[in-house]
Amino acid sequence: MFPGGGKFNPRMMKQMQKMMKDFGMDAEDLKAVKVTIELEDTILVFEKPKVQVMDMLGNKTYSITGKAKKVAKAEEKIEDVEVKVEVTEEDVEMVSSQCGVSKEEAKKALEEANGDLAEAILKLGN
């Protein structure tokens, strides 16, 4: 690949880098820890890869070198499930007395905060 019988010549490398710059090409090594590529049916994970990005006239090309590990992709995504929290009378009284609001307002704030006392009190305090 390199002239001179395949021996690496640092001076030749500098000349090649200068020529690349003259043609609008720039290369940079990235300090990547992990690279993940998601395919239709599997996921490729590169641990401790060598990643280089080349910029050629505004178009970036990424080169990843390393050993890839295949990981099976999950079949289905878990759907978000809305959970209704049961608000106790004690919680309603606590929020009502702390914020100086009616029990109805306190109960509504607790329901909106999914039963979180601190969040309900902060919401009513503002």
Curated annotation (Swiss-Prot):
GO molecular function: RNA binding
Taxonomic path: Archaea, Methanobacteriati, Methanobacteriota, Methanomada group, Methanococci
One of the protein's GO biological processes: protein transport
Positions in coiled-coil regions: none
Keyword Isomerase part of the UniProt annotation: no
Pfam families from the UniProt entry: NAC (PF01849), UBA_HYPK (PF19026)
Known partners and oligomeric status: Homodimer. Interacts with the ribosome. Binds ribosomal RNA.
Similarity comment text for this entry: Belongs to the NAC-alpha family.
Protein name per its UniProtKB record: Nascent polypeptide-associated complex protein
Biological source species: Methanococcus maripaludis (strain C6 / ATCC BAA-1332)
Annotated NAC-A/B domain residues: 10-77
Role this protein plays: Contacts the emerging nascent chain on the ribosome.
